[in-house]
């Protein structure tokens, strides 16, 4: 897999990243967490609010150099999700927007299971191929189909596949994981770039209320949300 050095650039993307991390903290358990695909550690330090032991794993040494400068309470390690080996097991393993990038998502999930304590949890979050935004894009003729991967998604973001809630659950079951929870996060009516401009114009207080409203609105509409999550044991 070619690793693309991409970080969240606009303010809306950063809001989304924080919401995803908060969701992982809500669903996680125990005292230790492994954050796979941590990148430059933009959001990994948030886990210190809940977990005593926080470890970040990423394939990019350039990202990890940046992450290590920001917080010395977190151990950052280099490794690929499908093949990493650690002499440690964790109460919670979190993968935020990662499964759509890797060569073999089932192998990654199986490897995570080997690093999970008994009774621990694996948390997976991915973009939703069936989101309202993508379905509108199909109707507008911008996207060929909900499962179509655009050149930008493939070449810039490094996406290799799309997920619906059904296909995400199926990959978890193929990895012999028990799915104990699932849902959606963030009803998103417009693309990130446009929402980013709107939020910037309205200011942080408005954006905070807007994001909370999008999360609340999406709670009963998981299939329509921008992101999907599953909780596995």
Residue spans of the language-model regions?
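Conserved N-terminal segment of class I S-adenosyl-L-methionine
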Residues: 1-88, 92-94, 109, 224-228
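Generic enzyme active-site microenvironment
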Residues: 33, 56, 98, 123-126
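Flexible loop residues that form catalytic
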Residues: 41, 98, 185-187
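A generic structural signal for alpha->beta connector loops
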Residues: 51, 73, 119, 176-179
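Active-site micro-motifs of SAM-dependent methyltransferase domains
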Residues: 83, 100, 131
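A short SAM/SAH-binding and catalytic strip from SAM-dependent methyltransferases
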Residues: 92-103
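S-adenosyl-L-methionine-dependent methyltransferase catalytic module, highlighting the catalytic core
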Residues: 103-111, 121-231
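Basic phosphate/pyrophosphate-binding loop/patch that engages nucleotide-derived ligands
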Residues: 114
């Amino acid at each position: 897999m070619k690793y693309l050095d991409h970080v969240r650039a606009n303010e809306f993307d950063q809001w989304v990243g924080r919401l995803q991390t908060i969701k992982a903290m809500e669903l996680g358990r125990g005292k230790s967490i492994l954050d796979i695909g941590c990148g430059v550690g933009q959001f990994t330090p948030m886990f210190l609010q809940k977990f005593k032991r926080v470890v970040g794993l990423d394939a990019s040494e350039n990202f990890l150099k940046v992450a290590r400068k920001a917080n010395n309470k977190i151990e950052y390690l280099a490794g690929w999700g499908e093949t990493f080996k650690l002499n440690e097991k964790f109460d919670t393993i979190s993968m935020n927007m990662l499964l759509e990038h890797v060569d073999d998502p089932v192998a990654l999930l199986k490897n995570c299971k080997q690093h999970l304590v008994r009774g621990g949890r694996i948390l997976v979050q991915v973009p939703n191929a069936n989101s309202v935004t993508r379905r509108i894009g199909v109707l507008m003729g911008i996207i060929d189909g909900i499962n179509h991967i655009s050149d930008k998604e493939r070449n810039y973001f490094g996406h290799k596949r799309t997920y619906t809630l059904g296909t995400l659950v199926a990959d978890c079951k193929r990895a012999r994981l028990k799915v104990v929870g699932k849902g959606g996060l963030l009803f998103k009516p417009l693309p990130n770039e446009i929402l980013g401009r709107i939020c910037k114009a309205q200011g942080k207080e408005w954006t905070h209320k807007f994001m909370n409203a999008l999360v609340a609105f999406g709670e009963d509409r998981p299939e329509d949300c921008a992101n999907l999550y599953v909780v596995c044991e």
